[in-house]
Regions:
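Walker A/P-loop
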Residues: 22-43
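Conserved SF2 helicase motif VI
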Residues: 319-340
């Protein structure tokens, strides 16, 4: 069986092979869900007598990619970045013809990065291909890993916004809701009380009171879920911040989800749990009429793909743009023609505007495609965003503006 590539991946593959011939290195920066690992598997398939060393953050990611492909490769030796680090002494014995660096932005981590450097120095003739949804390490001084590892040799680059605009990924329905806002209101109250001008204090307290009332009048999560989760026996991935946060969210399942479907099954996946593989496998094969929720922490941010997902639910404090896009990307799959649901449940006011970054990417892609005379590649220019707390966001922005100018 030969690997068939979607048009966008075939174009990227052609650029990769040309660049590898010319430069010996190439990076592909495509969003989650577009199937970029297939580009590397295709390369291995086309060069059966060449030896490939495939590095990735976890064996789990690699095994899932192979399972989804339904193929085996005799010419690929797999190794996780941490295993490479533990076996640094045997790097000299590897002698690959090709090195695949999957999720290559992770090579910026101090220890992993050192062993990857050592490998690249030990194999100067090996061609290297990097795959990632992002080349920037946002929380690490904006380091550009495509520059550091591939000398800026990018064979193909696409943002999440462009992938949606071009119809490579389906346009989602995006719902923004809010919960547990008391702490946020308390912090705003303290900022107001710290003002020196009594007139300003009174004015801002009025705004805060309006905001509090608007939040109290907004629908609770039970009604938000009941209204928007229309695939009542669908599969949803629920992202949480940590184990404690996950346990708290799971404790609310009966009150929040019973209006969607009284029969709910909860699966849990997190990296320290030995039962994760089984839970994940059961979730993937569950075809029952129950509402299926897979609660996870850090398992599915990158690399792992699940078929037949109806949507994702993000219960999140503020997170890096990389993780935010990876989590959204779990709901979007190339070749899928349904409208996936993204429920973004934030516990801070800043989180209400996260989606604006993606909307900006889409507008940028639209302008660029029109400017390049490629308007015919535009499939959609925007997607539906439902703000359950629109008034709250507007009031919060007014209050922020007022408080900022009060401090100046």
């Amino acid at each position: 069986m030969s690997i068939h590539l979607f048009k966008h991946n075939q174009e990227a593959y052609n650029s990769v092979t040309a660049m590898l011939e010319r430069e010996k290195m190439a990076a592909v920066i495509h969003p989650t869900g577009t199937g970029k690992s297939l580009i590397a598997f295709k390369l291995a398939e086309e060069h059966p007598s060449e030896k490939f060393l495939w590095l990735s953050p976890s064996e789990y990611i690699y095994q899932t990619q192979l399972e989804n492909l339904g193929m085996e490769f005799d010419n690929i030796q797999f190794m996780s970045y941490s295993r490479l680090m533990k076996n640094e002494d045997s790097i000299e014995t590897l002698h690959p013809d090709y090195i695949i660096l999957d999720e290559f932005h992770r090579c910026g981590a101090a220890e992993w990065g050192k062993s990857v450097r050592k490998l690249l120095n030990a194999c100067p003739n090996a061609k290297r291909l990097g795959l990632s949804a992002t080349n920037i390490r946002y929380l690490d001084n904006q380091r550009n890993m495509a520059e550091e590892i591939f000398d800026g040799k990018i064979a193909s680059e696409m943002t999440l916004g462009e992938a949606i605009v071009r119809g490579i990924l389906p346009e989602p329905k995006y719902v923004i809701a809010m919960y547990s806002y008391k702490k946020e209101l308390d912090q705003l109250k303290k900022r107001i009380q710290a003002l020196s001008n009594q007139g300003l204090i009174t004015e801002n307290q009025k705004l805060l009171e309006q905001l509090r009332r608007a939040l109290e009048q907004a629908d609770g999560l039970d009604l938000v879920f009941q209204h928007h989760i229309t695939q009542t026996s669908g599969k949803y991935i629920v992202f949480c911040a940590n184990k404690e946060h996950m346990d708290e969210m799971i404790s609310h399942v009966p009150e929040w989800f019973s209006g969607v479907n009284p029969d709910v099954v909860v699966y849990e996946a997190y990296s320290d749990d030995p039962n994760t593989d089984k839970a994940f496998a059961d979730f993937k094969t569950d075809t029952s009429d129950r509402l299926k929720l897979l609660f996870c922490i850090d398992m599915l941010n990158e690399g792992v793909h699940v078929e037949g997902i109806s949507g994702v639910i993000l219960f999140r404090p503020t997170i890096s743009p990389i993780i935010y896009k990876q989590q959204i990307g779990r709901a979007l799959t190339a070749g899928d023609n349904t409208t996936p649901l993204i429920l973004d449940v934030v516990n801070n006011f800043e989180g209400l505007t996260s989606i604006s970054g993606l909307q900006g990417e889409m507008q940028e892609a639209v302008h660029r495609l029109y400017a390049n005379g490629e308007g015919d590649r535009i499939v959609t220019e925007r997607f539906e965003v439902v703000e359950q707390v629109h008034d709250c966001r507007v009031l919060f922005e007014r209050l922020q503006e007022s408080l900022s100018s009060s401090w100046e």
